Amino acid sequence: MSGKVLTSIFDASVQLSSLQRYSMTKLVNPESVLEHQGSVAMMGVMLGIKLNSFGEDFDIGMIALKSSLHDIDEIGTGDIPRPTKYAKDSITQDLNNLAKESVLDIFDSIGIEDAYDIWDTSKAGRNGKIVGLCDGLAVLCKVWQETCLFGNKVIIGHAGPVQEMLEKKFSDVIAECKTEEGTVFIASLMVEANLIIESINSDKA
């Protein structure tokens, strides 16, 4: 670790920026894992601040930390397509083990071993639910961008699974809200997200 902290950080950044998401789908504007993490972090901080304006008490700093590290394991595993990742329990377990080893190696090379717990619980707990929701919203954003802005109909098939996934993630955040205003706000976002998905599906023809 001595004398190589910056190069280790640079290496992690470069590798994440080189990893492309949606490897089984042709994109007009390809997205890297680093770009995705940045989107999730920005959305998480913005939603956290907005929710706190209604009297909620989400930890904005922790949301930023969790979201900024949540996919760093893909340096070791790559962006694995869901059909492959979940084809068998044994494959899923092997990939999970590889992810953990990769993250430990990365953080050890920088000397921030304590950050492992932040990554490992990135979508757990109250603040992690915000990260999980924004992870899903970042996918919706990409599908919307490709379909509605660039006319790429190839990615439309992602809309259905995204809608199902977001329903659960919105519900998870609603369950963590302590104020009526926060609950109503998240519910309004769910309605807005469904309208966006409808606009995506309308481009099928």
Where are these regions (language model features)?
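Active-site metal-coordination segments of metallo-dependent hydrolases
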Residues: 27-37, 88-97
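Active-site alpha-helical segments that house and flank conserved acidic catalytic motifs
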Residues: 42-48, 60-80, 132, 136
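Short, solvent-exposed segments of well-ordered alpha helices
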Residues: 4-7, 27-34, 121-128
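Membrane-helix exit/interface motif
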Residues: 48, 52, 75-83, 107-116
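Divalent-cation-assisted or electrostatically stabilized phosphate/pyrophosphate-binding catalytic cores
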Residues: 85-105, 152-174
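Alpha-helical phosphate/pyrophosphate-handling elements in metalloenzyme active cores
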Residues: 28-63
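Histidine/acidic-rich helix-loop-helix segments that form or flank divalent-metal centers
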Residues: 64, 107-157
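Active-site flanking loop/helix segments enriched in acidic
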Residues: 12-36
